[in-house]
């Protein structure tokens, strides 16, 4: 009887152990690219088109690679009415997921194939109930889920939606993302986004690419210095079509990503040189602390001249609307004006270390976005002021209370001068 009882208990122990076995997903070699698309807004169709061009870019890959897209679009979306993570894995021979290159090429060539059919070949890895995807906890959960779904040696991440740099969330402006209609206040704040990225990936993302307007400013880059190695962004508006992913995607998987930041930016400018407008910069976020110190040194050494710099004489990058006017000015031009006409060599050298590559369209289709190349450095920055209009009062208060660049770059120590 005892023998039978022993065998019974042993069997129970064996099966209970079987149930508790944890399968650890295999880590994939190389880099996986994540794309976080806030698409419940006027960019819905453009972001959907971006996924198709991303697929074309994956088809050009010579090695296997994975792209995971988080999509939070309109409830009426045919493909994905609910927020979800969608996976696209190329075999390095033009095939994606279970479909061969020939099959995908035929689908793309067939005029009867809809965009929904094309992007619908993605594997849905996880669905979510309706949620506000600009909330900090939601962003953290989703990006963590994306990384868990496809464990890799490293990651790069793309953010696609509306944007307006470091600005606080008010009617007409949004730091990054818009989850809802045109006037929705459901947007993400850059300090919160940076904290999310630091939390989910302490080893840092290889890059952050902002496919969103006006993210190319010192305030944004500085927040990301402990979250990403490199950042690609525009200080101007980005046309709705976004990045030319068909040509850019293969670069995003290269091991030595720093060597391909230039080609990524060049492809962007080449794409818009004759059909749009734009600026683009690739920034080494590891150099942002040094840049903050360089700016701080100049500001503190020239405090008496702060009041003499007229921002009306500077190139400002909030060109698309009066709501954005003054959000960022050219950093190099400002420092030069502050120093009496010429920026110090040590500052200029640090700026060159920080901005690895930058360019702009020389003949934009809209004169609104024409750039003064003689006063363009690829790095925007906010210049606080004593204006008492509601816009600037809100901006200055948020700048002082929430943006780390304010304290790092010398503005906090000189408030008694510029704030009066």
Where are these regions (language model features)?
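Catalytic-core segments of thiol-dependent peptidases
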Residues: 73-75, 82, 86-117, 131-201, ...
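Extracytoplasmic/secreted cell-surface and envelope-processing proteins
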Residues: 42-47, 76-80, 165-169, 215-220, ...
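Acidic/polar, low-complexity intrinsically disordered N-terminal segments immediately downstream
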Residues: 21-73
